Amino acid sequence: MFREGKFNIKKYRLFIFVILLLVIYIFLLKNDWENSHRGLTFAMLDVGQGDGIFIESPTGTQVMFDGGPPRKVLGSFSRVMSPFDKTIDALIITNPDADHIGGFLDILKNYKVGVVFESGTLTDSKTYQSLREEMKNQNIPDILVERGMKLDLGGGVMIDILFPDRDVSEWATNDGGVVARLSYGKTSVMLTGDIGAKTEKIILSENSEAQLTSTILKVGHHGSHTSSSSSFVKIISPEYSLISDGKNNSYGHPHRETLDTLTKFGSKILRTDLLGTIIMKSDGQDVNFSFHK
């Protein structure tokens, strides 16, 4: 039987004090996180042999370019996302191979996703079909990108879609992948997915040098010799070249031919297999890198 009585505040004083301190600590932690993530954040996550890129604009809009292989990407989120944040505005599938989309299923099950963009290349892989089924179950819009589309992330950050410029449903998944250029003030990133020389030639033929030159090149196909042709790298003229690959991978990525090409044009090479997650921050003028294994 419940008995009425006076609440003894002295008895619970320490408990209340601890709770109050905890609330203040969480508030300060959240505020510090938000302050430290102003400007543009671009992170090539260490997902092993695959691609997983996180982008956050100054206004907090978050986009994932690819999600890496299964069971890899969530472990890297602590480097770039607040633990209180459980939403991602958009996922972009550059191509539907498992090393690019495997982690997206994990993301869909743990985060609220606003929209998915993809190129339109097709595959009957179990991984891709499972991803599409989960997207359908959650009623997530699925949009095919095309050349000329602009994704405004807010705060001056823009993603310009350069490819596909045509129906790529019957193309090889790598060649038909999404190519985009991220820009923020004087900072720009060329995002190439796994495209090879065939698609690089199309990109060069359809765009001026001013439209392509970028501060950073996300090196195509994990540094394979089938990508990053001399003519392409010369026009992009990247100050930095970022390569996402697994340590001691069976493909031998990055290939020596690619490394030599990047070096020939004076680009500084940064690799996830050597440095771990690569985080670039920009205020629209300068870029700063940090590395996290």
Protein language model annotation of sequence segments:
Residues 1-293:
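Non-globular, low-confidence helical/coil segments that flank catalytic cores
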